[in-house]
């Protein structure tokens, strides 16, 4: 398994099938909320240095990604936060340490870039809490969602 930081814009065509698999596996309200990535906004955020994309590859094949939005804290201007947009490992690579390796690689790279807080959210119906807790992450808040139309 090889981990890299890559340009989301550059790998758009390659990542799209994984994003579709991820959406069909995990997304709620699929009848109402269709997958429709805003590639222009991703590109703008990336050009501003506010979007970081980390990838997992096996023999050059993309098998996972971890995409984060990086911003100064609105309440904590002395700190830079990296918040998960999406994180995904193809099912056939979840048994090993691919997820751990991808998160650890991203954490190291983000720290080099001056990020002081890494925030990873998980779906309540598909958590990976044990992995995060084993990596010294703490449960810090709960998130509720309601489709309102």
Predicted regions and their residues:
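A short, internal acetyl-CoA/4′-phosphopantetheine-binding micro-motif in the GNAT/acyltransferase core
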Residues: 85-95
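A short helix-loop-beta-strand connector motif used in the catalytic cores of GNAT acetyltransferases and
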Residues: 43-55
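Conserved acetyl-CoA-binding loop of GNAT-fold acetyltransferases
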Residues: 132-142
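Conserved beta-strand in the GNAT
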Residues: 55, 61-70
């Amino acid at each position: 398994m090889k981990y890299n930081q890559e340009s989301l814009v550059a790998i758009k065509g390659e990542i799209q099938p994984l994003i579709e698999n991820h959406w069909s596996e995990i997304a709620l309200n699929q009848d109402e909320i269709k997958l429709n990535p805003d590639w222009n906004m991703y590109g703008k955020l990336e050009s501003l240095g506010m979007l970081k994309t980390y990838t997992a590859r096996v023999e050059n094949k993309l098998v996972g990604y971890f995409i984060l939005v990086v911003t100064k804290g609105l309440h904590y201007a002395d700190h830079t936060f990296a918040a998960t947009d999406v994180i995904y490992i193809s099912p056939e690579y979840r048994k090993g340490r691919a997820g751990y390796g991808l998160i650890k690689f991203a954490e190291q790279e983000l720290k080099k870039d001056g990020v002081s807080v890494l925030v990873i959210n998980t779906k309540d119906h598909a958590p990976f809490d044990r992995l995060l807790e084993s990596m010294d992450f703490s449960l810090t808040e709960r998130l509720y969602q309601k489709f309102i139309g």
